[in-house]
Amino acid sequence: SSDLFKESNHIEEIQGVYVPFWLYDGRMEARGAYKAEISESHREGDYIVTTTRHFDVARVGDADFVRVPVDGSSKMPDTHMDAIEPFDYSDLKPFSTAYLPGFLADRYDEDDKKCAARVLTRMKNSTAAALHDTLGGYTGVQTLSEQLDPRTLEPHYALLPVWMLHTRWREQDFLFAMNGQTGKLIGDLPVDKGRVAAWFAGISIPLMILTALIMLL
């Protein structure tokens, strides 16, 4: 239970961090060729008759992306940083030291070129999924070829607020991350995650009103 967790865990550190992120705008061009079929069955006397129609299908399109985030800190676990999305970028503000008290402000150690590989993978996966979504209505689809090419990619640098909690429970170390804007929590613990989230939020939410999303470029 969460009560047992609270009683038996030992908090090693809880810290608000402005994590460096690269926010990418981009466009992907997609082309695909497919073999598709529609099979229909009906009964004729004692027999089940199946009719299959075959189609050559082509798809061409563009996908536009706005502010796809990738954290630029090797010290932050990528899985945690990806999982606490989304952030509401309408709240982005110009840099001001007024937002920094009580938070660490980390600097990127992975530049936009290094992080581009990760964001392109995300964009390609999303574009491929959107392409496949247009292939509904068929009973079977075989991919013959797909080409997904980036046409533009523009990075922007921002600092986004994250709460990090390091704790030890039953001789194991656990790491939690919480979106400092929305309160979304990610972390692995073999107890009720909802109750742990409420407990963690009780510590940090009173300070969330002091945070902001900071746009640097």
Where is each model-derived feature located?
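Flexible loop/turn segments at secondary-structure boundaries
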Residues: 31-33, 172-173, 184, 194-195
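Extended, hydrophilic extramembrane loops/domains of integral membrane proteins
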Residues: 160-189
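Charged, low-complexity helical/coil segments in non-catalytic cytosolic or luminal regions
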Residues: 2-168
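Juxtamembrane boundary at the C-terminal end of a transmembrane helix
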Residues: 209-217
